[in-house]
Each structure stands twice: as structure tokens, then as C-alpha cells.
A protein has these predicted regions:
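Helix-loop junctions at membrane interfaces in 12-TM secondary transporters
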Residues: 81-92, 279-289
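Helix-to-loop junctions at the C-terminal end of transmembrane segments
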Residues: 49-62, 145, 246-258, 338
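A late C-terminal transmembrane helix in Major Facilitator Superfamily
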Residues: 313-343, 350
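Conserved MFS/SLC helix-loop-helix module at the cytosolic interface between two early adjacent transmembrane helices
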Residues: 49-87
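Cytoplasmic helix-loop-helix junction between adjacent transmembrane helices
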Residues: 94-128
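Short amphipathic helix-loop junctions that connect adjacent transmembrane helices
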Residues: 19-33, 215-231
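Structural signature of the two symmetry-related core transmembrane helices
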Residues: 64-78, 261-276
Length: 376
């Protein structure tokens, strides 16, 4: 129960401001390039978070760290939503990046510890709950705009209360399945080697796709496909719902097929489906391509996190940071591309990230029988 709350809360937090980026852009009166810098601040925060993440995991423990950083993100959200200054927005998103990166590492460490202690495979399902949080954020956004108020501060306040409630539930129930802090303080092995670099490239590319689809699909539908503002968040909804469904079945697929081959096929399907959807254009083509991308890319991150956990907690912490950087660096990259070449070109860049996943996964498939790739 606590782990489910934490994964859901992270998805709800990120999905809430991501689904309102089009409105935040208007509120701050900024261009696509400035929106790119706004999102870049989160990736810089994620990069800066790595030393703090390692220190907190060693000295505080994953459970307490998740609750602490999660509460900070909840309180940040109304400030982000009510902000009209681009410069203040950069500061707020930098802090958001630090907290989200640390929270991501903490909950994945917590999840892998549950797998180890109870001898179960649940990482994909936990990531499915994260995707459910993203989908819930999009649904809440659409519902608030349509039936309550389109004001960003109202949205921020509702999500803030919801997040704090989730963290309170996680705190009250965590005693029943908590991991010991001593487990979180294991000595960290050497982190940089061929294994972590290949795993890092894959999860970086996968989270670039995830983050870009979460942050730009609504803007793509509104600015390129020209849908109504109330329908724009449907892009996030379709993508995140598909990711949720894909991750529900990821563990069973892993028991039948080779992990590296699954990742390679996922990367290629992502590239082909998204490129085709962008080329065809139109709302329905976009929905179908977003759904296929969500179903296939959903397999990648849980497999990589599980493999990193099998190598050791240090590797898992590093890979979690790679994942946060990818998820937060992808969207501003799309913003810069959109400014100079158009948002359609930015979506093609997202599709190209799938090719990177496929190539890196083939390298894993070649070396899966060597000791350092034994978990794959």
C-alpha cells in the first residue's frame, strides 16, 4: 500500500503540471523556446540532485526520503500553477527537478527492496501505478476545466491536497511493510562502468520519450492538430493509460521472452508508430500512435530498473537519476527543436529516441551471457 501511494503520487504530481503546460505557457506569456528553458530547469535540478540523492539514501533511507521529498513537491505545485513570472518559474522548476529526481530514486529503491524482501516481482506493476497517476492527472485536469474552473491555482490546490493525503496514507501504513533503514545504507559500489552506461542510455532514451509525450502531447494536439483546450489533455490521457495497461502485463512478458529482445522490439515499434502518427497527422492518428508508444515504451524502464537493482543499490540509484534526467531533459529539448524547426520535428526527435533504445538493447542481447549482464 505505501509503495502504491508513492508511485501514484509521483505520477499525479508530474502529470498535473504537464497536462497544463499549454496554460502555463499563456500565463507566463512565453515562447516555445522560453518554455523549453522552463522545462530545462527541471532537468538541471535532476542532475544537481544526484549527490543529495545518494546522501539521503545512505543516511535517511528510501522510505523517509520519499515521504520528505514527496511532501515538498506537493507544496511546490500550487506555487508553480499560480506563477506568472518566467524567472520565478525557472527557480520553482529547478527545485521540482531536485525533488522529483530524489523521489524517483527513493521509490524505486523502496520498490526493489520490497521485491527482495518478499521474493516477488512487482516493479512493473508499481510503474503501472505511476502511469495511472499520470492518467489520473490528465483526467482531473480535463474535469476541473470542464466542470469546476480553468484557473490554474484551483487545479494546484486540489492536487496539493490530494498529494498530501496520499503521503499521509503512505506514512500511516508504511509500518506494516516498511524496509529497514539499515538496508538503505548499504555501501555503494563503483557506479560508472560499461553495464551502467548501457543501462543508463536505454533508460535515458526511454524517459526522454515518456517525459516528452507527457509534456508535449497536449501542446501538440492544441497547436498542431488544433483541438479545443478541453480536449488537449486527452493526449496525455491516452499515452499514460496505454502505459498503465502495458505495465500491467510486463512481468508476464518478461517470464516468456528475453528482456533485451523485448526492449529492442519496443524501441523499434515506438519509432515506427510515432513517426507514422505524426506523418499522418489528425486527432485519431495521434491517439492511435500515442497509445502504441505508451504500450511499448512502458516495458523498458521497469526492466532496466529491475536489472539495475539486481546489480546493486548503487547502480539502481544511478539509473534512477539517469531516468529522472531523461524525463526532465527531453521536454526542453523538444521545446528548442519546436522553436527552430516546429513541434512536428520535435516529435520526430522523440521517435528517433526509440532507435537509440533498439541499438543499445541489441548490445545487451549480445552480452547477456557475460557476468555483468547476468540480470538480463
Amino acid at each position: 500500500m505505501p509503495a502504491l501511494c508513492l508511485f501514484f503520487a509521483l505520477g499525479l504530481n508530474i502529470g498535473s503540471w504537464a497536462s497544463r503546460l499549454a496554460d502555463l505557457k499563456i500565463a507566463m506569456s512565453i515562447t516555445d523556446m522560453e518554455l523549453g528553458f522552463f522545462l530545462l530547469a527541471t532537468s538541471l535540478g535532476a542532475i544537481s540532485a544526484f549527490p543529495l540523492t545518494i546522501w539521503l539514501l545512505r543516511h535517511v533511507g528510501a522510505r523517509k526520503m520519499a515521504l520528505l521529498l514527496g511532501s515538498v513537491t506537493a507544496c511546490l505545485l500550487p506555487l508553480i500553477m499560480n506563477n506568472t513570472s518566467h524567472h520565478l518559474g525557472l527557480v520553482l522548476m529547478f527545485i521540482e527537478g531536485i525533488c522529483c529526481a530524489g523521489l524517483n530514486a527513493a521509490i524505486n529503491t523502496y520498490g526493489s527492496d520490497i521485491e527482495r524482501k518478499h521474493d516477488i516481482k512487482c516493479m512493473s506493476r508499481l510503474h503501472a501505478v505511476f502511469s495511472l497517476g499520470l492518467a489520473a492527472a490528465a483526467l482531473i485536469s480535463m474535469g476541473l476545466i470542464r466542470f469546476v474552473s480553468s484557473e490554474l491555482i484551483v487545479h494546484g490546490a486540489v492536487i496539493c491536497v490530494s498529494l498530501l493525503t496520499l503521503f499521509a496514507v503512505a506514512y500511516r501504513t508504511s509500518e506494516q511493510c516498511r524496509t529497514s533503514d539499515s538496508d538503505d545504507k548499504q555501501p555503494e559500489p563503483k557506479l560508472i562502468n560499461k553495464t551502467t552506461l548501457v543501462l543508463g542510455i536505454i533508460v535515458l532514451s526511454a524517459t526522454i520519450i515518456e517525459g516528452s509525450m507527457n509534456d508535449w502531447s497536449a501542446i501538440y494536439l492544441k497547436d498542431v492538430i488544433d483541438v479545443s483546450p478541453s480536449l488537449a489533455p486527452s493526449g496525455v490521457l491516452v499515452f499514460s493509460a496505454a502505459m498503465f495497461i502495458g505495465r500491467l502485463f510486463a512481468d508476464s512478458l518478461r517470464s516468456q521472452y528475453n528482456d533485451a529482445i523485448l526492449i529492442a522490439f519496443a524501441g523499434l515499434i515506438v519509432s515506427l508508430s510515432l513517426a507514422t502518427g505524426v506523418w499522418l497527422s489528425g486527432l485519431y492518428a495521434s491517439w492511435v500512435s500515442f497509445a502504441i508508444v505508451g504500450l511499448t515504451v512502458s516495458l523498458v524502464s521497469p526492466i532496466i530498473y529491475a536489472s539495475a537493482a539486481a546489480i546493486g543499490p548503487g547502480c539502481l540509484s544511478l539509473i534512477s537519476t539517469f531516468g529522472s534526467i531523461g524525463g526532465l531533459a527531453g521536454p526542453p529539448t523538444i521545446g528548442f527543436i519546436a522553436t527552430h524547426f516546429g513541434l512536428t520535428s520535435g516529435m520526430y526527435f522523440v521517435a528517433a529516441s526509440g532507435v537509440v533504445i533498439g541499438i543499445a538493447a541489441l548490445k545487451l542481447a549480445k552480452h547477456q551471457h557475460t557476468p555483468q549482464y547476468a540480470s538480463l
